[in-house]
A protein has these predicted regions:
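N-terminal helical cap/lid subdomain that shapes the substrate entry/recognition surface
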Residues: 1-87, 95, 108
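Non-catalytic pre-domain segments flanking phosphatase-related domains
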Residues: 1-2, 214-218
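Phosphate- and divalent-cation-binding pockets in alpha/beta enzyme and binding domains
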Residues: 18, 47, 84, 109-112, ...
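Substrate-recognition/cap helix-loop segment adjacent to the acidic, metal-dependent catalytic center
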Residues: 24-26, 47-54, 78, 86, ...
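Short acidic capping loops at alpha-helix termini that bridge into adjacent secondary structure
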Residues: 30-35, 58-59, 121-125, 153-157
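Short beta->alpha linker loops
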Residues: 39, 43, 80-84, 105, ...
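Structural recognition of alpha->loop->beta junctions
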Residues: 118-128, 188-208
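Acidic, Mg2+-coordinating phosphoryl-transfer loop and its flanking beta/alpha structural elements
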Residues: 157-198
Length: 218
């Protein structure tokens, strides 16, 4: 199971643009140099709550709606794959691994991004958050994916760049590989208990295959 933002793609420019647009839609004048890298990977509601706090504003729902409108119109196209990711996906697919996307991003946005980058064909399933909010957090999302696709936790692996990916995987009985080219730090991933870390996106496929030892899920 692969995370999206900070794992497969650098989505920061588009996410930042949509966050700024959401704050402006609520009447605020945000700093254009705002750095939100460390919040990426959190549920969107949590990100907006953090951003609105400095304005004494609690209109989280309105901010989320404004963000999603802007992101759906233009923000999602500001994503670029990390070096070597396409080759890693090709290599993993070639070995027969089943590959699933597991992102806190809205599933419809994730699908559009993968289609835009021509990554969709590598995936056996694309899952993300849904309008009802029931899959906003990683443990619930991963449990849903495992059940939906009849996957065994002990034969599967979660790959991500934030502590939410690691703790979410462990909560449902999966191992977790932390990637160091995304938005989380080595300390964050180690503290969360990542089973292994990988430094370079070019080494992703090799590390995944080594951890799985030929087992047929990802």
């Amino acid at each position: 199971l692969l995370d999206l933002d900070g794992t497969l793609i650098d989505s920061y420019p588009g996410i930042l643009a949509s966050c700024l647009a959401a704050l402006r839609a609520l009447g605020h004048e945000p700093d254009e140099t705002l750095d939100i890298r460390r919040t990426i990977g959190s549920p969107l509601e949590d990100i907006m709550q953090i951003l609105l706090r400095s304005y004494g504003d609690d209109r989280v729902g309105e901010a989320v709606a404004a963000y999603r409108q802007h992101y759906g119109e233009s923000g999602l196209l500001g994503s670029v794959p990390y070096p070597g990711i396409r080759k890693s996906l090709e290599e993993m697919k070639r070995t027969g691994l089943r590959i699933y996307l597991a992102t806190s991003k809205r599933a419809i946005f994730a699908s559009r991004i993968l289609d835009h980058l021509k990554f969709a064909t590598y995936f056996d399933g694309i899952d993300g958050s849904v309008p009802s909010g029931e899959l906003d957090h990683k443990p619930e999302l991963l449990a849903h994916i495992l059940s939906k696709h009849s996957l065994s936790p002990s034969h599967s692996l979660m790959v991500g760049d934030r502590r939410y990916d690691i703790s979410g995987a462990h909560a449902v009985g999966m191992r977790a590989l932390g990637v160091l080219w995304g938005y989380g730090t080595r300390d964050e991933l180690e503290t969360a208990g990542a089973d292994q870390l990988v430094d370079s996106s070019a080494d992703l496929a090799g590390t995944v295959l080594s951890m799985l030892n030929g087992k047929q899920s990802l």
